[in-house]
Amino acid sequence: MEDRLQMDNGLIAQKIVSVHLKDPALKELGKASDKQVQGPPPGPEASPEAQPAQGVMEHAGQGDCKAAGEGPSPRRRGCAPESEPAADGDPGLSSPELCQLHLSICHECLELENSTIDSVRSASAENIPDLPCDHSGVEGAAGELCPERKGKRVNISGKAPNILLYVGSGSEEALGRLQQVRSVLTDCVDTDSYTLYHLLEDSALRDPWSDNCLLLVIASRDPIPKDIQHKFMAYLSQGGKVLGLSSPFTLGGFRVTRRDVLRNTVQNLVFSKADGTEVRLSVLSSGYVYEEGPSLGRLQGHLENEDKDKMIVHVPFGTLGGEAVLCQVHLELPPGASLVQTADDFNVLKSSNVRRHEVLKEILTALGLSCDAPQVPALTPLYLLLAAEETQDPFMQWLGRHTDPEGIIKSSKLSLQFVSSYTSEAEITPSSMPVVTDPEAFSSEHFSLETYRQNLQTTRLGKVILFAEVTSTTMSLLDGLMFEMPQEMGLIAIAVRQTQGKGRGPNAWLSPVGCALSTLLVFIPLRSQLGQRIPFVQHLMSLAVVEAVRSIPGYEDINLRVKWPNDIYYSDLMKIGGVLVNSTLMGETFYILIGCGFNVTNSNPTICINDLIEEHNKQHGAGLKPLRADCLIARAVTVLEKLIDRFQDQGPDGVLPLYYKYWVHGGQQVRLGSTEGPQASIVGLDDSGFLQVHQEDGGVVTVHPDGNSFDMLRNLIVPKRQ
């Protein structure tokens, strides 16, 4: 233990002596550990029991779609699991298990630290991975979890990589604000490098937090008590960094002035970055502005109004490098927050959501934090899962005939080795992956096989699943199987995350957790209605995703739409998903891989389906439950099979009425070829699935998707970049 303590003078402690604690100190520790932790209001109730599918489109796959909760993750030694709620409250905010480290929590130990181990400030996080977690300053916090110490950023200052969040009192409203601040900071900073703690009022006064704080975030709406204000100013004078979020906290001669006309309204903000460039975005105003004060630091933001009201100020403080960035716009609030008053305000704020994160990252970087993207996650093994038990024996027999003696199926891009179990020694690369065939070895907090089964109501599609938590791209997983698999064993690859997601042409597809990611294998006879019109496949898949959501009872008005040729949109405003189709003709059959990705639970950086549901509930007083990716993948595959069958039976006329019901282009005016090209009006799709437009001179022309990109915001059709 001695050689694991780092001293200011670079020496190593030679000996640590044990100390007999006095009875009063022991009693104080006992009281601290017995404190009851207050959690936030309980989360959404579990979704109702799954219902069987009904009809063709109306209730395709009515399983347990309405469940937002995730399953538990493995528990870390010595700490509560980071992603597992410890009570009925919100994850990450309601754990009564506190792992206390005496050197921070006990006054006698602090005394001992000063006298016996002089100058010891901190223990090396890299060398002591199994020490109990330090919860100084978080007693009574709503479920703060023990931080993961391994891999934390090494700071030149020697301070622990802690970001402390102060929201004032322990009221329910304050705890809700704590959750919002935690959420947005987690989206912005390198979460492998920092740990976020709730700094309580008592702890702010009592505990030695300032020596172990890289950034203090003040997000209290109430006036800061004078004694706590004094602590915060002392921290700044020692070189501390402060971020104020819609708080009355101020310094350096600035005064916060109330402007009721601005309160909870959407305003246009001009933000000046450190390099002098400007970012313009829509923001939610707190109703306060900054006045007076000295010249500003590198960053500043003002409203685009006549007074150019100061909303973001950067204030250097003291001689040791202290500084604060103070904001009176709600950078911490998502567009769907309760303070956002109208659907139009929600739309405007969502359109600026990427820029909101850009501004916040610029501020955090200026305050010395890293906002670098986290490292690419390691690839994980594939799991072979079967949606129907009757598929088990035929598929395993087929597999036995097509693997070599080592259980390997090779293709030009990928080798799959089918094994009964996975060991950590097995190599996983984008070109070589193990496939675990024992279903008992499978578990995932992001994918429920039972939920998928309940919502899959197909006769052939999506029956055999290759599942991965992390893979390079689902588009390559089926490469060695697609030309050999029997058609009745519909194959689908599903992933939680992709490291090299693919879009059209050279485009990449971002694939964060919360996105429904899949590649489906479909066989289409050449001499069939759809075989003669293969471009329609991408339209059918986009339509299937929209119908998968809007055919659920109660969800009919969720404003999810299709955008030609291959996109899924929220209204005509923001992209929520997309489709990529690769087809190969062999003999009389098209072998088609349909890649599809759409945002279900990942609100940032743009928008997701559950955002639309939450906003719908707020505007209509409804109580619709959030949806799950596993449910919607199964429902979309179910709807797609029915759309294909209808198309094969009736041709385009069998599906176009539903497509036009949901598409965003009806009667839209566009220009052809370039911004100066002839004007035309969109009239529909032609017999092959290409876009048709009516020109001013009376002619109708067809526009091909692989030659043009559709720019919804400018109403233009322009050549696609090669």
Curated annotation (Swiss-Prot):
Q: Where is the composition biased (Low complexity)?
A: 46-55
Domain BPL/LPL catalytic positions:
459-648
Residues bearing Phosphoserine are: S295
Give the enzyme's main class according to its UniProt record, as a single word: ligase
Swiss-Prot/TrEMBL catalytic activity = apo-[methylmalonyl-CoA:pyruvate carboxytransferase] + biotin + ATP = holo-[methylmalonyl-CoA:pyruvate carboxytransferase] + AMP + diphosphate + H(+); apo-[propionyl-CoA:carbon-dioxide ligase (ADP-forming)] + biotin + ATP = holo-[propionyl-CoA:carbon-dioxide ligase (ADP-forming)] + AMP + diphosphate + H(+); apo-[3-methylcrotonoyl-CoA:carbon-dioxide ligase (ADP-forming)] + biotin + ATP = holo-[3-methylcrotonoyl-CoA:carbon-dioxide ligase (ADP-forming)] + AMP + diphosphate + H(+); biotin + L-lysyl-[protein] + ATP = N(6)-biotinyl-L-lysyl-[protein] + AMP + diphosphate + H(+)
Q: Name one Pfam family in it.
A: BPL_C
Choose one Gene Ontology CC annotation of this protein and give it: mitochondrion
Keywords, sorted A to Z: ATP-binding, Cytoplasm, Ligase, Mitochondrion, Multifunctional enzyme, Nucleotide-binding, Phosphoprotein
- CDD domains linked to this entry: BPL (cd16442)
Q: What is its main location?
A: cytoplasm
Q: Which GO terms describe its molecular function?
A: ATP binding; biotin binding; biotin--[biotin carboxyl-carrier protein] ligase activity; enzyme binding; identical protein binding
PANTHER family cross-referenced by the UniProt entry: BIOTIN PROTEIN LIGASE, BIOTIN--PROTEIN LIGASE
User: Which NCBIfam families does this UniProt record tie to the protein?
Assistant: birA_ligase (TIGR00121)
Q: What is this protein called?
A: Biotin--protein ligase
Q: Which organism is it from?
A: Mus musculus (Mouse)
| Gene name as annotated | Hlcs
